[in-house]
Amino acid sequence: MTDTTERGYDRHMLEALVCPVTHATLRYDAEAQELISEAAGLAFPIRGGIPIMLLNEARQIRA
């Protein structure tokens, strides 16, 4: 058993991070390399293994 998700993202890091808008938990999208905040309707990119948790870098996932 390992503490990394598919493509090597650390599960412990994911558990420690929350949405900067709603403080809700995030879902890891391995294919898109994004952290998804369902509560805020935002997707935060992961670049070079580093989550970019800035609102101006987030992508809206719903209208």
Curated annotation (Swiss-Prot):
Stretches of the chain forming a coiled coil according to its record: none
Q: Which domain of life is it from?
A: Bacteria
InterPro entries hit by this protein: Trm112-like (IPR005651)
What Gene Ontology terms describe where this protein resides (cellular component)? cytosol
Q: Which family does it belong to?
A: Belongs to the UPF0434 family.
**Protein's UniProt name:** UPF0434 protein Pden_2369
